[in-house]
Regions:
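Short secondary-structure boundary/capping segments
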Residues: 4, 26-28, 68-73, 106-107, ...
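Conserved Rossmann-fold NAD(P)-dependent oxidoreductase catalytic core, especially the SDR/UDP-sugar
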Residues: 12-75, 80-81
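Strand-loop microenvironment adjacent to phosphate/nucleotide-handling motifs in alpha/beta enzyme folds
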Residues: 75-95, 100-266
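A generic secondary-structure signal
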Residues: 4, 43, 140-141
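Conserved Rossmann-fold cofactor-binding substructure of NAD(P)-dependent oxidoreductases
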Residues: 1-9, 186
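Short Gly/charged-rich anion-binding patches and loops
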Residues: 6, 39, 73, 163-164
Length: 266
């Protein structure tokens, strides 16, 4: 398709995003979120794509989950393909209202079945955007974003998921219970937009901020390549080794409420 159509701009939004699924099957996160991104980057470079926008997530900031680290690696890979004549950048944002698997869709489905609504924790908060807001800001980010940068979109204040559930129950006029089931592996109480080493800088658009410009050393590029070579060896399937390699690649990745926490104690 790339050779035939020769696109000039690519918006890369394909990803696996189901948190518990990826904690259980980290190789799937690698195959889709990392290797899939790398395949698109190579195809884009081969046909001379001038602008590549990688759609990332707030879970990539100080990641504690397989999903988060896989998207953080994708950010770094995207930056590594940029040069002086192109703009390869990433855009982080949070939950998109109404998208497949979003909390609103899940809650409404639970209400339609008579409940209960299941929450992982009473104090969980998340950032939200509408689909139209997300599309408009991603397109604008592609227009103003600089090469090798990571951009953050203005999503307003984080929203209490408990409050969302309460409002939906109230509007349904049905006696629906709320059940607290506990945080899932890799889940945060609140999402962060920036790494601990980043600061939010203004851009030409008041709703788009610059988190950082990725500058990857030659040594880090060699490390990325060596990790990818190991993961691509025939028959490789060791989840613990995969996560260990990713922790070497992304040192800010610290597992939480997960079987992979043991690797952080080594």
């Amino acid at each position: 398709i790339f050779v035939e159509r020769k696109p000039e701009i690519v918006f890369h939004a394909a990803a696996l995003k189901h948190l518990p699924l990826l904690e259980g099957y980290p190789n799937e996160a690698y195959q889709t979120n990392i290797l899939g991104t790398l395949t698109l980057l190579k195809a884009s470079k081969n046909v001379g794509v001038s602008v590549f926008v990688n759609i990332s997530t707030d879970k990539a900031a100080n990641p504690i989950s397989v999903l988060g680290y896989s998207k953080r690696v994708a950010e770094r890979l995207t930056a590594s393909f940029g040069n002086s004549t192109t703009r390869y950048l990433s855009v982080r944002f949070g939950n998109v209202l109404g998208s497949r698997g979003s909390v609103l869709v899940s809650f409404r489905d639970q209400i339609s079945k008579g409940g209960p609504i299941t929450l992982t924790h009473r104090n969980v908060t998340r950032y939200f955007m509408t689909i139209s807001e997300a599309v408009q800001l991603v397109i604008q980010a592609g227009a103003v974003g600089k090469n090798q940068s990571v951009l953050v979109l203005d999503m307003g204040k984080p929203v209490s998921i408990f409050d969302v559930a309460t409002q939906l129950i109230r509007s349904s006029n049905r006696p629906i219970d709320i059940e607290i089931v506990g945080l899932r592996p890799g889940e945060k109480l609140y999402e962060e937009l920036l790494l601990n080493t980043e600061e939010m800088l203004p851009s030409h658009n008041p709703h788009i901020f610059i988190a950082q410009k990725e500058v990857l050393s030659p040594e880090h590029m060699l490390l990325i390549q060596s990790v990818l070579d190991r993961l691509n060896e025939p028959g490789f399937s060791d989840a613990m080794e995969l996560i260990g390699l990713m922790k070497a690649l992304i040192p800010e990745y610290k597992s939480n409420n997960s079987k992979f926490e043991v690797l952080d104690r080594v």
